[in-house]
Amino acid sequence: ITSRGLGDVYKRQASRFGFPVMVNTFGQMGASSPVTIAGCLVQTNAETLAGMVLAWLANKDVNAIYGARPMVTDLRTGGMAGGSGEQSLLTAAAVQLAQYYNFPNSTISGATDSKLPDNQAGYEKAINLTLAVQTGANLITQAAGTQAGLMATSLEAYVIDNEMLGAILSTGKQIEVNEETCSVEAIKKVVEGDGHFLGQSATCLLY
């Protein structure tokens, strides 16, 4: 945690020496930003763009990364409600804003409000991460092992989340369509032959 002025100094110095600068802004709904999803996005977007401009003023060639991280606040406790459906929407919308400007982006995803790697943690993380991946997030941080709204970590969760992330990331891949993957010849052979694909060479090669 740094003072506002010291953070700006770090950003300017990093920019001058050519380090990539990830501009992270954390508007928390109802606390440090408006309580509505749209209002939180407006403010967080403006703050992120301002940070990127500051980096470019220090070095016009620096690689600045759009790192907006709008957050849902649990107004009962003041903590982050990272496992909520609204958090998933905020994350996806922030990624889409970066894409609108054609900026490389980074976001937080995979948070949960559960304090244990249980069923609640599983479905909250899965919803959050799937939306982030499907909307095209370039760099996702805090994606594994975190619990209790990013206030705790779990070694068990790291193992579980690693497996989950592999499955979710595969849903973001484009389907490869070419002569080989369409497998017309293999289909023809199976129809005229054994009636299954288990013995086809393509099954072993492409699995």
What is each of the regions a protein language model found here?
Residues 1-10, 207:
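Single conserved hydrophobic/aromatic residue that forms the stacking wall/gate
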Residues 8-164:
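Glycine-rich anion/phosphate-binding loop at the beta-strand->alpha-helix junction
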Residues 156-206:
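Catalytic-core signal marking the mid-to-C-terminal active-site face
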